[in-house]
Amino acid sequence: MSRTPLDTVEHAAATPDVELPWAELGLKKDEYERVVEILGRRPTGAELAMYSVMWSEHCSYKSSKVHLRQFGEKAPQSDALLVGIGENAGVVDVGQGYAVTFKVESHNHPSYVEPYQGAATGVGGIVRDIIAMGARPVAVVDPLRFGAADHPDTKRVLPGVVAGIGGYGNCLGLPNIGGEVVFDACYQGNPLVNAGAIGVMRHEDIHLAKASGAGNKVILYGARTGGDGIGGASILASETFDDAKPSKRPAVQVGDPFQEKLLIECTLEAFAEKLVVGIQDLGAAGLSCATSELASNGSGGMRVTLDDVPLRDSTLSPEEILMSESQERMCAVVEPEKVDRFLAICEKWDVIATVIGEVTDGDRLEIYWHGGKIVDVDPRTVAHDGPVYERPYARPEWQDALQADDANKLPRPSSSEELRDQVLKLVASPNQASKSWITSQYDHFVQGNTVLAQPEDSGMIRIDAESGLGVAIATDGNGRYAKLDPYAGAQLALSEAYRNVATTGAKPLAVSDCLNFGSPEDPAVMWQFAEAIRGLADACQQLGTPVTGGNVSLYNQTGEVAIHPTPVVAVLGVIDDVARRTPVAFQEEGQLLYLLGDTREEFGGSAWSQVVHDHLGGLPPQVDLERERLLGEILISASRDGMIDAAHDLSDGGLIQAVVESALLGGKGARLVVPDGLDAFTFLFSESAGRAVVAVPRSEELRFNDMCGARGLPVTRIGVVDGDSVEVQGEFTLPLAELRKAHEETIPALLA
């Protein structure tokens, strides 16, 4: 893109007729014309580079912003929320002076192009968001979705993604404590690689992304800037995949976790010495984002000299330097008298650091190269005033037919033997089978503070050794439910994550989300998106869990075929003492099994309908958010007061899936009795929401029943922990050994 002579601001003003490649950079004609209108002239090549990446779908949220406003407009009152939407990550108060920051992001398209690096840099990016808030990262989670488990391309993509996540996180010394792995043909050619991270700090250590104080220095530190990731935000993250297009591999970033580890320690030491006024990590859009966001969020302007940026490749043009998404880089604003100390800390940690500019008392972002001014813009127009589209949306014509194709009318097992066979088939199916072949590649217990990790209902980390204070996090989403009804599907995702946190004994506090959808240019996809946002915002309001931030990933489709709408929801909770946590595994024989909540004939989008009939149709389970909240309160109280020794939420696969998982984890069987008013099939396979199964010591039975009765929660005794099999009275008996073989051999057989 570089031209001779240098395309300075002065040169651009004098050459209005020069044609710039705006379309190649992802801008629409009207967007380019708006840039010209803002500047009062044509942009320079460097300015065009900045606007193109910052006005991309990935960075500007131009198609989603009009809907995302609901998260603010409907936000519930929360005393816990310290920093909300708009910063690098949300921050919540968890008590005892501690604050926790958490966020979920996506790295979907890069992970298909280059699975290992795409996934690894996804972890690196979300961890830097956490550091930028002032926190020490303490854990990561990874909700993943791939195409059909037996498809050859899944065998190409999944091992690389898993190795990238594990390799990067393990090198950072961060435990991987949660996530999901889901297989569905709709993700063929468009896997979803979502990554989340948690960080811990004291309240007074919170940092924000803003540049203030004229004369303060802008320091770029971390890795050298190279040619990797150029245009990643505008090319990879903001377009539909098309196999006919040229290779997009150069747009995938390359990660170095050891450099990131040094960056973490260096940054935290600078924070501890109060050296930093403002800070921004360099992720999507690189320096274009860091400089424009710091300048627009502060009280002044900024002047930057690109010649001072340390380069890995000396042939890079100024446009490429501004667009590069090379990893492991951060930008700090530091008072002049503290610069030497900041640079000394960087040198101690072997981190390259350079003063590249300073905060000015104006309101312009000016960038220089070889003595010429190549950028002169109002930073707000780059970072915040991009186009906002109210894209047309319409309920798709096929939605009615899809919902009318009722899963409740599918053929059901006609004998006990057939029921038994379908249970085995369910627990051995790729989505319900053990993912230990995958999760064993992650370190769950590094740092020594992990209390719960996969395959528990939520991951849990101790953050204060003396008091036992801890936090739990769960991520959930069900694209099949959302395809049937995106409003309900988003609420079901939140409900399940909320429930998964509560079953461990933690109180849900706040939400982050990763919203994965197809092309916003398709009115049917935009309808799905609008409905999902509306559903999630309404549900967060009712459950009292504000959305603290998150990510939108659009254009998740290959050609004309979009993925299922897949809102992934992360819920963070707090527990006063991790010693009182409740695990999934059955603990002792003789304990009584209770089912909490109502069971109805709800099979739309269910695991049973998929595994047995390869069917998707009907309506997803009903959502009762008041009941969900009540269930959560009872689970938390029962855990805190020692009334239950095990708890497991009921979701995909229904009761039988939950009981089998608890039995296999604890190495103890269960004898179940079908309650009056239910048939065995509905009892075992229904996916009604707002339910959990708990193991109650006999000494606590009366107290537990009294509490549930007093609060109005339906509770049904369904069996006992006993023996070395799962028995459904009058129907079948399945030895744990047979269940374990079915549950644990599927994934290695497909992928190893």
From Swiss-Prot:
InterPro entries: PRibForGlyAmidine_synth_PurL, PurL_linker, PurM-like_C_dom, PurM-like_C_sf, PurM-like_N, PurM-like_N_sf. One of its GO terms (cellular component) is cytoplasm. Keywords: ATP-binding, Cytoplasm, Ligase, Magnesium, Metal-binding, Nucleotide-binding, Purine biosynthesis. The keyword Translocase does not apply. It catalyses: N(2)-formyl-N(1)-(5-phospho-beta-D-ribosyl)glycinamide + L-glutamine + ATP + H2O = 2-formamido-N(1)-(5-O-phospho-beta-D-ribosyl)acetamidine + L-glutamate + ADP + phosphate + H(+). Its EC number is 6.3.5.3. The keyword ATP-binding applies. Its main location: cytoplasm. Mg(2+) 2 binds at residues 129, 281. The active site is at 58, 107 (proton acceptor). ATP binds at residues 61, 103, 513, 550. Substrate binds at residues 106-109, 128, 253, 325-327, 553. It comes from the Bacteria. Mg(2+) 1 binds at residues 105, 551. One of its GO terms (molecular function) is phosphoribosylformylglycinamidine synthase activity. It holds the Pfam family AIRS_C. Pathway: Purine metabolism; IMP biosynthesis via de novo pathway; 5-amino-1-(5-phospho-D-ribosyl)imidazole from N(2)-formyl-N(1)-(5-phospho-D-ribosyl)glycinamide: step 1/2. It is found in: Cytoplasm. GO terms for biological process: 'de novo' IMP biosynthetic process. Part of the phosphoribosylformylglycinamidine synthase complex involved in the purines biosynthetic pathway. Catalyzes the ATP-dependent conversion of formylglycinamide ribonucleotide (FGAR) and glutamine to yield formylglycinamidine ribonucleotide (FGAM) and glutamate. The FGAM synthase complex is composed of three subunits. PurQ produces an ammonia molecule by converting glutamine to glutamate. PurL transfers the ammonia molecule to FGAR to form FGAM in an ATP-dependent manner. Belongs to the FGAMS family. Monomer. Part of the FGAM synthase complex composed of 1 PurL, 1 PurQ and 2 PurS subunits. This is Phosphoribosylformylglycinamidine synthase subunit PurL. It comes from Streptomyces avermitilis (strain ATCC 31267 / DSM 46492 / JCM 5070 / NBRC 14893 / NCIMB 12804 / NRRL 8165 / MA-4680). The gene is purL.
